[in-house]
Amino acid sequence: GPPFSNGNLHMGHALNKSIKDIIVRSHAMRGYCTPYIPGWDNHGMPIESAIIKQNKLNRKKMPVTEFRSACHEFAQHYVDVQSEGFQRLGALGDWAHPYLTMNPSFEAEEVKVFGRMYQRGYIYKGLKPVYWCPHDETALAEAEIEYQDDPCTTVYVKFPMYDDLGKLSHLDKSKLNFVIWTTTIWTLPGNLAIALHPQEEYAVVRADGGEMYIMARPLVEKVMKIGGVEHYEIVETHPGAFFENMLASHPFLPKTSRLVLADYVTMDSGTGCVHTAPGFGADDYQTCLRYGMDMVVPVDDQGRHTDYAGKYAGMKTEESNPVILADMKESGALFASEEIVHSYPHCWRCKKPIIFRATPQWFCSVESFKDEACAACEDVRWVPAWGKDRMRSMILERTDW
């Protein structure tokens, strides 16, 4: 695609343009008509982020029209700067007549295409969890995500039994706890459910002192070791489906969490009891939707907790992590914690950690034309040949954009 007009050229630009120039020239020398029309992408966060940083602008205090005008001037300036640089590289092209995505004629064509897509039912507005950058306050596509290794505190949290539906009346309900595991402490205020695998065996484990914990049978030894519990016994076991629709008390908010079933629950990590917050995860969202539960998104555009989070309202997600952790330690809700390093998504523009958050967005549905796109792959000569299978696989796995 075309480069962003958001700064000076770098070595990546030089490499990309040189390769393109070699291809264009070699075909022209073989008698093909291969005019190269240079172009620039003048829209999007790369432009906004660059001008805010370079000109020290506060876009929230500027009228929208003024900010757009500033971005337009900034983009045009770097079109001129980059064009001069590409020409100095000796790249062959119609530099006097480039295409710019900010030209009104170009934008008009985009609106026409968008209109046709809407008329065909490809465009819809929905509330779904998406990658969200609190720093740039924008949704991100999967292609705009970069993963980095970050230190993280993982927690094992007790959710006391609230309603066992009469199935465990022979046990002391006041001592029963479901134990969940999460690497994102800040999502706990958004918890609405605990997901179990319907067929896997879950154990009721009694520790010295009488407190009982419910977790997946294959993970008992590992979890109890992490919790520093040396002496315990398995009282009874049941399949996950046995616990469906029971209720647990939230560890620090005045509400309950529903026990639900999900096939994606695995036995390779955690406790087998999956913390489920529909506003912060795609699987969580779909599971709670299936059970007819309301959507709760207790974090705003800037990554701050809303009033729904109680005493943590106004805190940024990263600020709330140690506070929530300390509160759970003090209240006894924390079963255990560990320090780990894990791969975590970051914004490709600002390089800061992002969150997964449900927000109203316009989506392009790709289901209706996946087959057509795959069929079109057959009409292309692929070099190397394995590119076709790779492209087909990518198309089939593509979610709504």
Where are the model-predicted features located?
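N-terminal, positively charged nucleic-acid-binding surface of large information/translation enzymes
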Residues: G1-G210, A277-R290, D294-A309, N321, ...
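Short glycine-enriched loop/turn motifs at secondary-structure junctions
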Residues: S174, M267-T271, R357-A358, A385
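Short, basic/low-complexity N-terminal boundary segments at the transition from targeting/disordered tails
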Residues: I180-T183, R217-E233, E318-G332
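Protease-associated
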Residues: P189, A193, E200-C273, A282-Q286
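Generic structural signal for alpha-helix starts
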Residues: A216, V383-P384
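A glycine-biased structural micro-motif
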Residues: F243-N245, K311-N321
